[in-house]
Amino acid sequence: MLLNTLSPAAGSKHAPKRLGRGVGSGLGKTGGRGHKGQKSRSGGKVRPGFEGGQMPLKQRLPKFGFTSRKSFVSAEVRLSELAKVTGDVVDLNALKAANLVTKNIEFAKIVLSGEINKAVTVKGLRVTKGAKAAIEAAGGKIEE
């Protein structure tokens, strides 16, 4: 096989439409754009979501919901990630030092995901039931 003999498989490539090249081509004169109107002009297009002056669907449907501002300062930490914390005490500052949560986080919750091998003391963090059972089974404890 030589590089200069390579060619695409037969029928896999299509020649581009040649617009405005005579009436015999079927795409002469107006080039498949029809007669007059905004879409026949060069640069003529309507913005996404425009429905010809009718009230658009996006505006016909009601607004709903909101984003809680508390979600920006809250985080979940997996049980398996606690292995990255140096030391036996896990609190918010220890999580920040281990880069498990960002500096703007004020509330963290430990959730049961993965396993924990070392005994740790969790201070001042919320813990799910399953995570609490797993921490205590590993010899750790939870302090409020």
From Swiss-Prot:
- Name the UniProt key words of this record, in alphabetical order: Ribonucleoprotein, Ribosomal protein, RNA-binding, rRNA-binding
- Biased amino acid composition, Basic residues: 32-44
List the residue ranges of the region (Disordered).
Answer: 1-57
Superkingdom of the source species: Bacteria
Q: What Gene Ontology molecular function terms does this protein carry?
A: rRNA binding; structural constituent of ribosome
List where the protein spans the membrane. Answer: none
> What is one Pfam family matched by this protein?
Ribosomal_L27A
Q: Name one GO biological process term.
A: translation
User: Ranges of Gly residues compositional bias?
Assistant: 21-31
> Record keywords: rRNA-binding included?
yes
What are its GO cellular component terms?
A: cytosolic large ribosomal subunit
Q: Which InterPro entries does this chain map to?
A: Ribosomal_uL15, Ribosomal_uL15/eL18, Ribosomal_uL15/eL18_sf, Ribosomal_uL15_bac-type, Ribosomal_uL15_CS
Enumerate the SUPFAM superfamilies for this protein.
Answer: Ribosomal proteins L15p and L18e
Q: Which family does it belong to?
A: Belongs to the universal ribosomal protein uL15 family.
Q: State its role.
A: Binds to the 23S rRNA.
Q: How is the subunit organization of this protein annotated in UniProt?
A: Part of the 50S ribosomal subunit.
The name under which this protein is listed is Large ribosomal subunit protein uL15
Q: Which organism is it from?
A: Vibrio cholerae serotype O1 (strain ATCC 39315 / El Tor Inaba N16961)
The protein's gene is named rplO
